[in-house]
């Protein structure tokens, strides 16, 4: 199927995707697991994405509005926490991720970090900083559903240049993130296999040309997969 979910038992109330008063119907964990139970536009509209330049592509290709994408090029799960870079309106003050999430109270947070952090942190630091970020976000928006996105692959030639960022290494960190998600009852959203070639590297048709970033084909497919699986 190309998708791997890891989640643990949370009650339907805790993973409520939509307010019945807003949509005219209740959405439980069971129905949310079915494809397209929630209207695609509504599903995307109630989701906020937090990440680095790979997440920023959602803005570059105008697939989502700025108030739903909180991302800084080159950032990690640590550096993203302190920078007031988000404007939720033309005249609004610049907010940190924590302040913006507190203000917006999104139904769902999709968090995607990794490629910038792997070379800078030990495994322990990597997981600790991820945990600190999520603690900060759930502290101000306790009803947000947490979706941890698997780190997506890089091209084969890229990691020959950057030996610390092999897809084997990325897979290892994804196993750590999956374990962490299971332990904390978060959703682990792994669509890596959808974007890999036969050798397990980023497939050429999704490569923006630098082996690390993604092209428009990728983001269109990514949105399709989100709508299909609705994590």
Where are these regions (language model features)?
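Active-site segments of SGNH/GDSL-like serine hydrolases
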Residues: 112, 116, 138-171
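Generic structural signal for well-ordered alpha-helices
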Residues: 130-134, 174
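Loop/turn elements at helix/coil->beta-strand transitions in domains of secreted/extracellular proteins
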Residues: 44-46, 105-109, 141-146, 184-187
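N-terminal, intrinsically disordered, polar/charged segments of Gram-positive cell-envelope systems
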Residues: 1-46, 59
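N-terminal cationic-hydrophobic initiation segments that often serve targeting/anchoring roles
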Residues: 101, 137-139, 178-181
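A mature extracytoplasmic/lumenal domain signature
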Residues: 51-54, 62-63, 115, 150-153, ...
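Conserved SGNH/GDSL esterase-like catalytic core that processes O-acyl groups on lipids
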Residues: 37-129
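Catalytic His-Asp segment of secreted/periplasmic serine-dependent ester chemistry enzymes
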Residues: 154-231
């Amino acid at each position: 199927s190309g998708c791997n979910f890891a989640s643990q038992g949370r009650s339907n109330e805790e993973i409520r995707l939509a307010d019945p008063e807003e949509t005219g119907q209740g959405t439980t964990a069971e129905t949310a697991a079915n494809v397209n139970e929630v209207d695609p536009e509504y599903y995307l509209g109630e989701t906020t994405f937090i990440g680095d330049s790979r997440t920023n592509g959602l803005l570059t290709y105008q697939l989502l509005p700025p108030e739903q994408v909180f991302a800084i090029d080159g950032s990690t799960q640590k550096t993203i926490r302190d920078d007031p870079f988000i404007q939720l309106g033309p005249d609004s003050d610049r907010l940190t991720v924590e302040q913006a999430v507190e203000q917006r109270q999104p139904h769902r947070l999709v968090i995607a970090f990794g490629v910038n952090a792997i070379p800078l942190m030990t495994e322990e630091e990597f997981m600790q900083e991820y945990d600190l970020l999520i603690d900060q976000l759930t502290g101000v928006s306790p009803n947000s559903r947490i979706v941890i996105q698997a780190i997506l692959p890089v091209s084969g030639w890229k990691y020959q240049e950057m030996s610390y960022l092999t897809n084997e290494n990325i897979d290892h960190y994804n196993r750590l993130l999956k374990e962490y998600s299971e332990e904390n009852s978060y959703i682990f959203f792994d669509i890596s296999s959808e974007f890999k070639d036969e050798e397990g590297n980023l497939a050429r048709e999704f490569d923006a040309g630098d082996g690390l970033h993604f092209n428009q084909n990728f983001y269109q497919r990514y949105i399709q997969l989100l709508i299909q699986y609705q994590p």
